[in-house]
Design a protein with these regions (language model features):
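Mature, structured domains of secreted/extracytosolic soluble proteins
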Residues: 1-151
């Protein structure tokens, strides 16, 4: 965040982004990307690259897990049925949908999951943990299997 010069954004001091939703990659996801790209330290990554990658994970406003409409994948399609399309702070688009599992074969009472699909990479990403409240928004933590740059 510091390398990208985005401290004000994460503190709610940027116009239009006073409240944000951050689809947050794990440290492992970032480290995996760095190794794949040949970087040994964050300071080696160009500032513009850091900025783009982080902005791809941010949308304006607070979007709690329960605000995301139910949806479902459609085989061979990037965007399935339902859900919601978001535009990131970088301008890229991704589709997010929720899915509620059954509990002992009873519908609509099981756990609720979030999934994200990038229109750029056509990658589906599982959200590991939702609704992590921050001072100016909410974080939905992406699964460890996510590699930074796939969103």
């Amino acid at each position: 965040v510091e390398r990208a010069g985005l401290e004000d954004l994460f503190q709610g001091k940027q116009a239009g982004y006073e409240k944000i939703t951050f689809f947050g990659p794990t440290n492992l996801s970032i480290l995996r990307w760095m190794i794949e790209q040949g970087y040994n330290a964050v300071r080696e990554i160009p500032e513009a690259t850091c900025r783009e990658l982080i902005l791809r994970h941010i949308v304006a406003g607070i979007h709690w897990r329960d605000d995301i409409p139910r949806g479902e994948q459609v085989l061979g399609e990037t965007q399935g049925k339902g859900g919601e399309v978001f535009t990131s702070a970088f301008g890229t688009k991704f589709w997010v949908y929720s899915f509620q599992d059954t509990y002992h074969d009873i519908p609509d009472v099981g756990p609720v999951y979030l999934y994200v699909t990038s229109f750029d990479t056509r990658t589906q990403i599982d959200v590991a943990s939702t609704d992590i409240e921050t001072d100016n928004g909410v974080v939905h933590s992406l699964n460890y299997s996510y590699t930074f740059g796939q969103l």
